């Protein structure tokens, strides 16, 4: 019976895991820390095309995967910081723009990339460290047009208004914990991985952070 289960499981695994494409550029160096050349992935649908996005130590790569028998890299944006010092990038999209960050390098920036013309081309419309340089993770609450930047400044997490998608504006800094590793936010309710400080649920409703310059912790 055990042998049968193992064989059945093996056959089932082969049936559901069918590799349809592999891309690996040997010219892209791995990180010094972990030897990882690639670090993050994201996906969008633009102009009826399915686009896969992958981060590397060199920057951000865009692939048209609409036709799985003809997948190709259609665009590339070099990171502000590149090379073996890069371990981690992160992405999120909003209203036809891709927001890209890197967690390493003094020259890192927030990059905002216009992806509305994919799969033909992309265009970097913002590339600056005026708001922050490095960030471990970002999340965009699309319902409220807010970008949450984790561990990007002296604060655990910062919140930016994306009413103007190409000109983010800082509206609040959260500093109740030492570090926010990652976040998921829906309608201003943030579910936060706070590392050594555990898991927290926080309400960042505009009425709280604007008028009271405060937030409401719902659970921890």
Predicted segment positions?
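Bacterial Sec-dependent N-terminal signal peptides
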Residues: 1-16
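Feature marking well-ordered beta-strand scaffolds used for ligand recognition
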Residues: 13-220
């Amino acid at each position: 019976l055990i042998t049968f289960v193992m064989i059945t499981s093996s056959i089932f695994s082969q049936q559901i895991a069918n590799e349809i494409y592999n891309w690996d550029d040997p010219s892209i160096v791995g990180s010094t820390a972990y030897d990882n050349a690639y670090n993050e992935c994201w996906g969008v649908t633009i102009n009826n095309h399915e686009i896969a996005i992958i981060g590397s130590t060199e920057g951000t790569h865009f692939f048209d995967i609409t036709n799985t028998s003809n997948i190709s890299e259609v665009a590339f944006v070099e990171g502000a910081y590149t090379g073996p010092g890069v371990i981690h990038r992160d992405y999120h999209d909003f209203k036809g723009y891709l927001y890209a960050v890197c967690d390493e390098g003094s020259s890192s920036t927030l990059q905002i990339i216009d992806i509305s013309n994919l799969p033909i081309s992309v265009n970097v419309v913002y590339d600056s460290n005026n708001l922050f340089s490095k960030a471990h993770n970002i999340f965009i609450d699309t319902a409220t047009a807010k970008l949450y930047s984790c561990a990007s400044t002296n604060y655990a997490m910062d919140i930016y208004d994306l009413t103007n998608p190409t000109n983010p504006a800082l509206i609040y800094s959260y500093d109740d914990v030492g570090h926010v590793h990652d976040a998921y936010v829906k309608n201003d309710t943030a579910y936060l991985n706070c590392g050594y400080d555990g898991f927290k649920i926080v309400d960042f409703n505009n009425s709280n952070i604007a008028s009271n310059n405060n937030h409401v912790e719902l659970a921890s």
